[in-house]
Design a protein with these regions (language model features):
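N-terminal segment of the mature soluble domain
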Residues: 56-107
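Post-signal peptide N-terminal segment of mature Sec-exported envelope proteins
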Residues: 29-47
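Bacterial lipoprotein signal-peptidase II cleavage site
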Residues: 21-26
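Envelope-exposed proteins and targeting segments
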Residues: 47-49, 99-101, 150-154, 175-177
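Low-complexity, compositionally biased segments in intrinsically disordered regions
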Residues: 104, 109-157
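Bacterial N-terminal signal peptides that target proteins for export
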Residues: 1-7
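C-terminal motif of bacterial Sec signal peptides marking the signal peptidase cleavage site
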Residues: 16-19
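Short secondary-structure boundary motifs at beta->alpha junctions and helix caps
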Residues: 163-202
Length: 213
C-alpha cells in the first residue's frame, strides 16, 4: 500500500473538515487485540492537569484530505478515552488553548510502515503538520519507532502541549505516548466496538505512568 499523508487535524476557530467517506461499520470479531504501548521516559505526566480531546476520530482516508469519524460509535470510543483520562486525575478542557495534553484517536484505513525511525523529526507517512498549525509547526517522536500500522488499527497518542509557545509557528511538539491496538482485519471485516473499548482500557492499564499527581 502506498503511503498516505494527512493534512492538519484542527483549524483554530473553524469547524472540522468534512469528509465524504463512510463511517466505519461495527460487528463482532473473535479474540482480543494485541496492544502495543510506548512512551517518552522523560515526560512529566504527573505535572499535567488538563487535556484536550476532540469530538471526532481522525481516519487515514483516501487522498490528501483528513477525514473524520463522528457517528455514535465514534462517540462511544471517545467517551471511553475520556473516562480513562478522567480516571487518571486529568480534567478535559473545552478549549485547545491552555490544555496541557492533546489526545488523538486515529483509525487506520490503509496499512503503513514505520521502520527504522530512531527519534527526531519524522517525515514519513504522516504529514509533519499532523496536529495542524494551531499546535505548532509539526510533531515528532522522541523515542524509537519500528513497526507496522495495519488496516483497521486504532492508535491513541498524547502530545505534550506545554511545549507549545503561543504564536511560535515553527514549534514542533513531542508525541509522548502512543498505543497501537492490533487485531482488526482489512477487506470486509468490520470493527467490533466492544473489542475496541477493551483495547483502549488495556492501553491505559499497561500505562500506569499516565497519572496526575
Amino acid at each position: 500500500m502506498k503511503k498516505k499523508n494527512l493534512m492538519c487535524l484542527f483549524l483554530a476557530g473553524t469547524a472540522l473538515l468534512s469528509s465524504c467517506e463512510k463511517d466505519p461499520d461495527l460487528s463482532e470479531m473473535d479474540g482480543d487485540f494485541t496492544v502495543y504501548t510506548q512512551y517518552d521516559p522523560d515526560m512529566d505526566f504527573g505535572g499535567a492537569s488538563t487535556y484536550y480531546l476532540p469530538d471526532s476520530i481522525l481516519t487515514t482516508g483516501q487522498g490528501m484530505q483528513a477525514a473524520y469519524w463522528k457517528d455514535e460509535n465514534a462517540q462511544t470510543l471517545i467517551s471511553q478515552v475520556k473516562e480513562e483520562m478522567d480516571g487518571r486525575g486529568y480534567t478535559r478542557s473545552t478549549e485547545k488553548t491552555g490544555a496541557d495534553l492533546g489526545v488523538q484517536i486515529t483509525y487506520i484505513e490503509n496499512t503503513v510502515n514505520m521502520v527504522g525511525f530512531t527519534g527526531g523529526y519524522w517525515d514519513g507517512w504522516w504529514d509533519p503538520y499532523y496536529w495542524g498549525p494551531f499546535w505548532g509547526g509539526g510533531w515528532y517522536y522522541p523515542f524509537p519507532i519500528s513497526y507496522q500500522y495495519n488496516t483497521g488499527n486504532i492508535v491513541l497518542e498524547l502530545v505534550d502541549l506545554r511545549d507549545s509557545d503561543e504564536g511560535e509557528s515553527g514549534k514542533c511538539l513531542p508525541v509522548v505516548w502512543l498505543a497501537n491496538s492490533e487485531g482488526m482485519l482489512s477487506g470486509s471485516t468490520r470493527i467490533d466496538l466492544t473489542l475496541v473499548q477493551r483495547a483502549i482500557a488495556q492501553s491505559f492499564t499497561q500505562s500506569s505512568y499516565i497519572q496526575k499527581q
